[in-house]
């Protein structure tokens, strides 16, 4: 099921949430809408679902304009950040709910419903919890049950609104890897909203970077990271440094893309060591370049030669190994 977003705009009073958005999502693709709070990503997801109405523009599913269709007629599965499970129902009944609510002529028999529910619970690896209640589950388990419930009605499109946002970091990492594997198995056109760059990079086939109601860049994780369209995309997709040049330009580079030396070396810049911070396998060194207010951060392996006996206040020499040259604004 392909999705086309055509010239979609949405305003809430004086706030322009979306401004002439155009986006094509291929059938079977997993796309991340990535951006900071207030960028319009959740509004766009809700418009695709039919939960919000655009002021202008169209939503097309597989060649059919569904802009005037009610959310119930779009056949989408929606997974919210906070699970939205029915607390008074067992896991089994939560997953079965959508099937039991179908019109009488479309409703499967109870035996078919039971078969489908157990199939989905096995798929999310939680069939052994079928008789439990939501409060007896961990956050990660609840979110997997919410996903199984969304898939029970066999939607054409799966939409996920920050599905892992309410979970702790370790569970989030496990679940996003699980979701990527699951998507490979079910091959269902899916769109998920996130503000977590690492999550988008790890899970999505393509990333749509949004800011202030517009799309800044669309591309594969590798494309948006290695070939950012502008300063905003570069900074939003990871830690970054800015080094001013004398000819009205500056260069952008990542902390892990820095060469360090204790000795003055050709092509290296002198800087004062302001902080040395061990981070496990790596160490972050914060540097101050004379004449520049912005600090430079470098991350190197913890046993790097330049770190031996290094102390704050000393002079260290650095060189960006990979950089992007940008004109000053």
Curated annotation (Swiss-Prot):
Q: Which domain of life is it from?
A: Bacteria
Binding annotation for ATP: 35-42
One function term, GO molecular function aspect: ABC-type thiosulfate transporter activity
What CDD domains has UniProt attached to this entry? ABC_CysA_sulfate_importer
- For this chain, the annotated S-S bridges are none
Q: Which InterPro entries match?
A: AAA+_ATPase, ABC_SmlMolc_Importer, ABC_transporter-like_ATP-bd, ABC_transporter-like_CS, Mo/tungstate-bd_C_term_dom, P-loop_NTPase, Sulph_transpt1, TOBE-like
Protein EC: 7.3.2.3
Question: Which keywords does the record carry?
Answer: ATP-binding, Cell inner membrane, Cell membrane, Membrane, Nucleotide-binding, Sulfate transport, Translocase, Transport
| Topology with respect to the bilayer | Peripheral membrane protein
Subcellular location, in the record's words? Answer: Cell inner membrane
Q: What is its main location?
A: membrane
Instruction: Kindly indicate whether the keyword 4Fe-4S belongs to this entry.
Output: no
Q: Which GO terms describe its cellular component?
A: ATP-binding cassette (ABC) transporter complex
Annotated ABC transporter domain ranges read 3-237
Show the catalytic activity.
Answer: sulfate(out) + ATP + H2O = sulfate(in) + ADP + phosphate + H(+); thiosulfate(out) + ATP + H2O = thiosulfate(in) + ADP + phosphate + H(+)
Q: Report the protein's function.
A: Part of the ABC transporter complex CysAWTP involved in sulfate/thiosulfate import. Responsible for energy coupling to the transport system.
> What assembly does the database describe for this protein?
The complex is composed of two ATP-binding proteins (CysA), two transmembrane proteins (CysT and CysW) and a solute-binding protein (CysP).
Give the UniProt family note: Belongs to the ABC transporter superfamily. Sulfate/tungstate importer (TC 3.A.1.6) family.
- What's the protein here called? Sulfate/thiosulfate import ATP-binding protein CysA
Which lineage do the record's taxonomy fields give for this organism?
Answer: Bacteria, Pseudomonadati, Pseudomonadota, Gammaproteobacteria, Pseudomonadales
């Amino acid at each position: 099921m392909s999705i086309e977003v055509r010239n979609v705009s949405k305003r809430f009073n004086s706030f322009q949430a979306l401004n002439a958005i155009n986006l094509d999502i291929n059938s079977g693709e997993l796309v991340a809408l990535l951006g900071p709070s207030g960028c319009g990503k959740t509004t766009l997801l809700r418009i695709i679902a039919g939960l919000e109405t655009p002021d202008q523009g169209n939503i097309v599913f597989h060649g059919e304009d569904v802009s005037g269709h009610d959310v119930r007629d779009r056949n989408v599965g929606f997974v919210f950040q906070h699970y939205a499970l029915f607390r008074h129902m067992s896991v089994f009944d939560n997953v079965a709910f959508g099937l039991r609510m179908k019109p009488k002529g479309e409703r499967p028999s109870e035996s078919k419903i039971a078969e489908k529910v157990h199939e989905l619970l096995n798929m999310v690896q939680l069939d052994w919890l079928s008789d439990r209640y939501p409060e007896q589950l961990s956050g990660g388990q609840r979110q997997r049950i919410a996903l199984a419930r969304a898939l029970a009605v066999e939607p054409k499109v799966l939409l996920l609104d920050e599905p892992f946002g309410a979970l702790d970091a370790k569970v989030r990492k496990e679940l996003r890897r699980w979701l990527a594997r699951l998507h490979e198995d079910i091959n269902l056109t899916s769109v998920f909203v996130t503000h977590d760059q690492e999550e988008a990079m790890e899970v999505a086939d393509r990333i749509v970077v949004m800011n202030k109601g517009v799309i800044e860049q669309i591309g594969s994780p590798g494309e948006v990271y290695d070939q950012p369209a502008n300063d905003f995309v570069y900074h939003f997709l990871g830690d970054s440094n800015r080094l001013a040049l004398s000819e009205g330009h500056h260069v952008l580079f990542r902390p892990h893309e820095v060469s360090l030396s204790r000795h003055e070396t050709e092509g290296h810049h002198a800087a004062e060591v302001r902080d040395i911070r061990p981070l496990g396998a790596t160490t972050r060194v914060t540097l101050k370049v004379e004449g520049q207010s912005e600090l430079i951060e470098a991350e190197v392996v913890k046993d790097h030669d330049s770190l031996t006996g290094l102390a704050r206040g000393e002079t260290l020499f650095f060189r960006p190994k990979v950089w992007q040259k940008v004109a000053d604004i």
